[in-house]
A protein has these predicted regions:
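Short, low-complexity disordered leader/linker segments with a strong preference
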Residues: 1-32
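Secondary-structure end/capping motifs
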Residues: 228-302
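Stable alpha-helical elements in mature extracytoplasmic
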Residues: 42, 51, 73, 91, ...
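Pocket-lining segment of extracytoplasmic ligand-binding domains
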Residues: 90, 164-258
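Conserved H-loop
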Residues: 61, 161-162, 265, 301
């Protein structure tokens, strides 16, 4: 008579324990990263990584959360609703200077590699032809933001004294654009692609940031998230880097994503150039220090922030 092999109770327990350990490991790997983004050209690699399945390819579960304003995005990050976000150099330093443990993990875009991000424009029909001629006239901006910094630097570089720079608050970019184009304000600082749209409709370009290092865009995570998810953070950045390569090698293949996510006006959908993106890299030390110095002069932040505190270079692919 044949006998069946007996499975011992200890072996069953061992198998179950192994399964539990494996499942816990997989659960940790499958943490859903909620990452805040804006409908900005410089965020295109993130949209491409999501749309083309590159996050999944690298084993990362990512949910891109779209915000219409920087303020809304920052509130979500501070509240703990996000693990990270797309940003300029200014905002993370403001948060960090006010006690939020935010870390920059990569620079994604720099005007020195391609073209402008922001510009100061005079209204259609304006007789103002230079930033020097604009001296003392109101410019619509969003205060203590990268567009505020760009506006100030462009004026100063044009020989305008800081004391004579006149600005008016306009947080909503769409409203800022409309009030410029309808002549309700003399000038405004705007981002691309609205700069191109405004020029095509008669606004006059007075200056742009094509040579300013401070106009960088970056990716940030909370330090707590990085501490608990180092490998996941690296794979996230690897997916974004692959998206950069895809965009640069075949820009037309992602035009549909750019048109949809960046909300290009109808007149630009077929002709606006797809940006080229540099390799992911740490933010420029000099540019970051310049931003910190500007924020301290404005008394927006008061504490000293070292580059090594604000940046983690160890996660780059």
């Amino acid at each position: 008579m044949k006998t069946r092999p007996t499975v011992t109770k200890s072996l069953v327990i061992a198998c179950l324990l192994s399964l539990v350990v494996y499942s816990l490991g997989r659960a940790k790997d499958n943490i859903a990263i909620k990452f805040g983004v804006l409908p900005a050209l410089q965020a295109l690699p993130l949209f491409v990584a999501e749309s083309r399945g590159l996050f999944s390819k690298h084993g990362v579960d990512v949910e891109l959360i779209l915000f219409n304003t920087t303020a809304e995005k920052d509130i979500a990050l501070v509240s703990g609703s996000l693990q990270g976000c797309f940003a300029d150099l200014v905002t993370p330093m403001i948060l960090r200077g006010n006690g939020r443990d935010i870390v920059v993990v990569a620079k994604t875009y720099d005007t020195r590699f391609d073209r402008r991000m922001f510009a100061v424009l005079a209204k259609p029909g304006s007789e103002t032809r230079s930033l020097k001629e604009l001296e003392g006239k109101p410019v619509a901006i969003s205060s203590n933001s990268v567009v505020d910094l760009v506006n100030e630097k462009l004026h100063v570089d044009a020989g305008v004294s800081k004391d004579t720079i006149n600005t008016i608050e306009s947080k909503n970019i769409g409203l800022r654009f409309q009030t410029l184009m309808t002549g309700q304000i003399e000038a405004a600082a705007l981002p691309e692609p609205l700069v191109t749209v405004a020029i095509s409709k008669g606004a006059r370009l007075l200056g742009d940031d094509s040579g300013l290092g401070e106009s960088q865009t970056v990716l940030v995570f909370t330090r707590e998230f990085i501490k608990n998810n180092m490998d996941l953070s690296r794979r996230f950045l690897a997916a974004v880097e692959e998206a950069n390569n895809l965009i640069n090698e075949n820009p037309d293949s992602v035009r549909d994503i750019m048109v949809e996510q960046v909300r290009l006006p109808e007149s630009l959908k077929s002709q606006y150039p797809v940006p080229k993106f540099p390799r992911l890299a740490p933010p420029d030390r000099d540019a970051l220090n310049s931003v910190l110095s500007w924020l301290k002069q404005r008394k927006v932040i008061h504490s000293e922030i070292e580059y090594e505190q604000a940046v983690n270079e160890q996660l780059l692919p």
